[in-house]
Amino acid sequence: MKTMIRNTLAAAALALTLASPTLAQDLKEVRISSQPALLGSVPFTLAEEKGWWKEVGLKVTITNFPAGAPQIAASKSWDVGYTGSVPAVLGAARFALHTVAFSDDQSATNALYVRGPNADAIIKNPASLKGGTVFLTGNSTVDLAARSCLAKFGLQKGDVTVRSMGQAEIIAAMSSGNADVGGLWAPNTYTVEEKAGAKYLCSGKDTGTTVPGNLVVRADWAKENPQLVAKFLAVYLRAQRHLAANRKGALAVMKRHYDVGGVVISEAAMNKEFDTRPTFDLAGQLALFNRGAQPSKADGTMNTIAAFMKEVGSLRADEALPDPKGYVTDEYLKLVDRDPVLKAFANRSN
C-alpha cells in the first residue's frame, strides 16, 4: 500500500510539474551531439517527436557527426552526446569528457562475418582462417571484437592479414566477392547478410568482450548544470523504455530515423537491432555504474576498451590509461534516482 501511495504521489507530482504554465517559457538549452542512423540515437528522434524534451524544461539542438573522432574533436561545441566507447575513452583522455551512462550493449553486433564457398568450412573450423585476410575498420570497436574472436580461435597476431577500411568499403567488397571475411558493426552487419549472403562467425558477445555505446558529457558543463544532465538522462531512459515496450511504434520511428541518416534496412534487420542490443533502465544503469568498495562493471568495461586503444596506438605511448574513477560516474544517474519526478519520468514506458 505504501509503495502504491508513493507511486501515486510521484505520478501526481510529475503531472503537476509538467503541466506548469511557466515551463515552456523557461526552457534551458542543451546541445546534443550524436551520430546518425544508429540505435543509440533513435531515442533522440523519439523524444523530439513526443515533445519530451520540453516536458522536462529542455530546448535541445542535435548535431550529427559522421564518426566518433570528429565528434570528440568538436566537443567544445556541444554539451552532452551519444558516441562509441572508443571515442568516449579518447574524449576522457584528451577532452575531459565523462561517461554518465551506457546507451546499449553492442557486443553481439560488433562481429566477424564470412561469405563465399568456404564460409561454412570456416564457421565449422574458424582456425582455418590462418593465412587469410580479414577486412575491418581499424582502431574501432569491431577491431576489438575481432581480435578477441581471433584469440578465441587460437590465432596469434600475424596469423592473419588485417586490412583496414571503412564500413561502406567492406560492404562493397563483400557484396562484389572481393572480400570473404569482414568485421562490421550494426546496422552494416544486417546489410552484408542481406546483400552479400554473409554468415555470422563470431562477435564480442561470444568472447565476453563487452562493447557499449556511451552517453558522455563535458565535465565543466556538467559540473555547472547537473540538473540538466539529469533531465537529459531521464528523457533518454524513458525513450528507451518506450521503444522496448512498443515494438510496432519503435520500428516506425527507427525507419524514419534511419531514412534521415541515409540507411535503408529491412524490417527483419530493424527487429534484430532491438533483439540483439540490450538496453538498461534506470535500475540497470545504477547497477552497472555502482562502484562501492570494488570497481564497477562499467569501470571494467572501459578499462578493457582503454587497454585495446593503447595496444593499437589510439592512445599515444606517453598517454596514461585514463582511470575510470576520473571519468566514469553515476553522479547524474543518482540525481535522477533521488528526484521523485525525474525518476517517475525515466521509468515510464508510454
Model-predicted regions and their roles:
Residues 118, 169-267:
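Pocket-lining segment of extracytoplasmic ligand-binding domains
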Residues 25-166, 171-173, 180-186, 201-203, ...:
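Short, glycine-/small- and polar/acidic-enriched structural segments
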Residues 20-24:
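Sec/Tat signal peptide C-region and signal peptidase I cleavage site
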Residues 225-316:
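Secondary-structure end/capping motifs
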Residues 47-50, 56, 132, 137, ...:
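Structured segments of extracytoplasmic/periplasmic soluble domains
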Residues 6-18:
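Hydrophobic helical h-region of N-terminal Sec-dependent signal peptides
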Residues 1-4:
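N-terminal secretory signal peptides that target proteins for export/translocation
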Residues 301-350:
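Conserved C-terminal helix/tail region of periplasmic/extracytoplasmic solute-binding proteins
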